Swiss-Prot record:
Protein's name in the database: Ion-translocating oxidoreductase complex subunit C
Residue numbers binding [4Fe-4S] cluster 1: 377, 380, 383, 426
Organism annotation: Salmonella dublin (strain CT_02021853)
Residue spans of biased composition, Low complexity class: 556-565
Signal peptide location: none
Region Disordered, annotated ranges: 536-685
Protein task: Part of a membrane-bound complex that couples electron transfer with translocation of ions across the membrane. Required to maintain the reduced state of SoxR.
Keywords for this protein: 4Fe-4S, Cell inner membrane, Cell membrane, Electron transport, Iron, Iron-sulfur, Membrane, Metal-binding, Repeat, Translocase, Transport
Length: 704
């Protein structure tokens, strides 16, 4: 029948699947004009009354404010809120707001002074002289949001539309039972609404502007037609009454025949929709220079004696409005904010009116009926037939109860408009909308947690990348600041490397151990002492010019001293005296060193010509001969045997003697002798010891 009816109409309309026809109950409140409500003594203004983040506070406790003064700053999607009247800010604290759970949100609490003084208002009567961006910014800064129930910032919505909007739809359907706020506003302020529509059309520049209104509002239709009598830029479309024809997607399909895709928006098909109350607020913001500080609210239900529509200041407590309407609560009285299908019950009556509050319903017990017990689903599919969004509420119900979030998402639970049509027709009295709301809240919480985790991961990776960049920069700075070694340093490095290679080559040579021989480290010790002596020789800065006297050869002096000591001991033994203490080779070496030192001192004092350089190998041989003679002499005396001579210590003493001899050579100013090979020195020392033994034996034979 609807299709047959629309075929004869000049302006074609379409239909959507599903929908219901509940009792309208609109005549209780749409018969009386709009009226003002006395100011409440205290106002509670939540900072967040829209979709998006709350704005930044710009007032403090104790500040005096005027009506229309901004309480927060609007940046991006943050919509500012304004003072509903003049007064004093007494607190900025969390307060229960319009929410099913009465959640507390940060609010500005103002004590009214009763004067209701405005800020200085500056209207743009010639709005066409201003740019599109300036108009959008003014609408945003004056706090205009969608007053049809969504609360989306109007300025952001207009900015996002851009140049792709071809159809502007003004939603005047107001399909939910009991609510008549838009109906009464169109009856009393039709001209201002049309002017606001023209401002929106000037900003968007669409090809067509359509007003969709249900046929159950004859007075409002008459007023709009009277205002649009000579207008050709706006078309008024009257549609059949059907719930929920006021839904954005449903009204778009009715007026244009286009369906919004799943998960998409109406702007994806070139359509932008605004509510008639939003159009009126746009006119007051642009032309009159008045921020949104009040809105029309329907007060209805059998529990109020004076139902109707009132201008309610934002932040007015619900209790104050109901008392003005003659509220007579019963024992178990409920108050619903919104309509009976999409609204929610208020936990208490001190919550404030906000921008999305369009109705306060106070029904009697008989009016709402007794609560029904929830029963099991009988799979009758009545909910699927009534769903206007072409969903499967029965399946979504099972997925919601089973916490199957992935399947619920796959069945487009996000497209549910929560109209309540499925719950209305359910024979088992299952509150399907409550299950769907809870499921969508859980899915949103999961997505929010995943988003936070992704952001935290991105921050961590960015930090790691920054640390790597800083590390690379530090290394680059260190490399650029490194000083290249000088030529002499390079020579020293090359010499050190050569010494290391020589040591490694020496270490790789095989060590031959003869059978029956004892370990002898004299060669290694002699080599070490030779290297130390060579290093000390290189470090000498000023070699002495004086030379030694040939007659004062320290090695010869040491030999003579040792021979003298041996003869003295032999003379004592022959004289029949007590045996003398055995000769300690270490003491002998010390005495020889003292004698050599005295000899060197004598050489320096004489200042004679430099003597022939002392050969350390010869000195070692002579010292070995002296030690051999001394040992032979001790054996012949028949005294107690002395402490055996340690070959290692003897080698050390020989090395010390050679090192001192080389130092003496350098100090005398003579040409440096060829550096001694430690292996050759050790061999020479061994040969010297053998020769000393043979000489001692020969001397004994001669004496006998």
């Amino acid at each position: 029948m609807l299709k047959l009816f629309s075929a004869f109409r000049k302006d074609k309309i379409w239909d959507f699947d599903g929908g219901i026809h509940p009792p309208e109950m609109k005549t209780q409140s749409n018969g009386t004009p709009l009226r003002q409500v006395p100011l409440a003594p205290r106002f509670v203004i939540p900072l967040k009354q829209h979709i998006g983040a709350e704005g930044e506070l710009c007032v403090s406790v104790g500040d005096r404010v005027l009506r229309g003064q901004a309480l927060t700053r609007g940046r991006g999607r943050m919509l500012p809120v304004h003072a509903p009247t003049s007064g004093t800010v007494i607190a900025i604290a969390p307060h229960s707001t319009a929410h099913p759970s009465a959640l507390a949100e940060l609010s500005v609490i103002i004590d009214a002074d009763g004067e209701d003084r405005w800020i200085e208002r500056e209207g743009w009567s010639d709005y066409r002289a201003h740019s599109r961006e300036a108009l959008i910014e003014r609408i945003h800064q004056y706090g205009v949001a969608g007053l049809g129930g969504a609360g989306f910032p109007t300025g952001v919505k207009l900015q996002g539309g851009g140049d792709k909007i071809t159809t502007l739809i003004i939603n005047a359907a107001e399909c939910e039972p009991y609510i008549t706020a838009d109906d009464r506003l169109m009856q009393d302020c039709a001209a201002q609404i049309v002017e606001g529509i023209r401002i929106l059309a000037h900003i968007l520049q669409p090809r067509e502007v359509l007003i969709g209104i249900e046929d159950n509002k004859p007075q409002a239709i008459s007023m709009l037609r009277a205002v649009l009598a000579d207008a050709h830029d706006i078309s008024l479309r009257v549609i059949p009454t059907k719930y929920p024809s006021g839904g954005a997607k449903q009204l778009t399909q009715i007026l244009t025949g286009k369906q919004v895709p799943h998960g998409g928006r109406s702007s994806d098909i070139g359509v932008l929709m605004q509510n008639v109350g939003t159009a009126y607020a746009v006119k007051r913001a642009v032309v009159d220079g008045e921020p949104i500080t009040e809105r029309v609210v329907t007060l209805t239900g059998e529990a109020v004696s004076r139902p109707g529509n009132v201008w309610a200041r934002l932040g007015t407590p619900v209790r104050h409005l109901l008392n003005d309407a003659g509220f007579c609560p019963s024992a178990d009285q409920m108050v619903i904010m919104g309509g009976p299908l999409m609204g929610f019950t208020l936990p208490w009556l001190d919550v404030p009116v906000v921008k999305i509050t369009n109705c306060l319903l106070a029904p009697s017990v008989a009016e709402m009926g007794a609560p029904q017990e929830e029963k099991s689903c009988i799979r009758c599919s009545a909910c699927a037939d009534a769903c206007p969004a072409d969903l499967l509420p029965q399946q979504l119900y099972w997925f919601s109860k089973g916490q199957q979030h992935d399947k619920a998402t796959a069945h487009h639970i996000a497209d549910c408009i929560e109209c309540g049509a499925c719950a209305w027709v359910c024979p088992s009295n299952i509150p399907l909308v409550q299950y769907f709301r809870q499921e969508k809240a859980e899915i949103n919480a999961i997505r929010l947690e995943e988003k936070r985790a992704a952001e935290a991961k991105a921050r961590f990776e960015a930090r790691q990348a920054r640390l790597e960049r800083e590390k690379a920069a530090r290394l680059a700075r260190h490399k650029s600041a490194a000083v290249q070694p000088a030529a002499k340093d390079q020579d020293a490095i090359a010499a050190a490397l050569a010494r290391v290679k020589e040591k490694q080559a020496q270490a790789t040579q095989p060590v031959v151990i003869q059978a029956g021989s004892q370990p002898d480290n004299s060669a290694v010790i002699a080599a070490r002492e030779a290297r130390k002596a060579q290093a000390r020789a290189k470090q000498a800065a000023h070699p002495m010019a004086d030379s030694a006297i040939p007659g004062n050869d320290p090695s010869k002096a040491a030999v003579e001293a040792a021979i003298a000591r041996a003869k003295a001991r032999k003379q004592e033994q022959q004289a029949g005296s007590e045996p003398v203490e055995a000769v300690d080779p270490r003491k002998a070496a010390v005495e020889a060193a003292i004698a050599r030192a005295k000899a060197r001192k004598q050489e320096q004092q004489t200042g004679s010509e430099p003597a022939e350089p002392i050969d350390p190998r010869k000195a070692a041989v002579e010292a070995a001969i002296v030690r051999a003679k001394a040992r032979k002499q001790e054996q012949q005396t028949g005294s107690e045997p002395a402490e055996p001579i340690d070959p290692r210590k003897a080698a050390v003493e020989a090395a010390i003697a050679r090192a001192k001899a080389r130092k003496q050579e350098q100090q005398t100013g003579s040409e440096p002798a060829e550096p001694a090979d430690p292996r050759k020195a050790a061999v020479a020392a061994a040969i010297a010891r053998v020769q000393a033994k043979k000489a001692a034996q020969q001397q004994v034979v001669n004496e006998d």
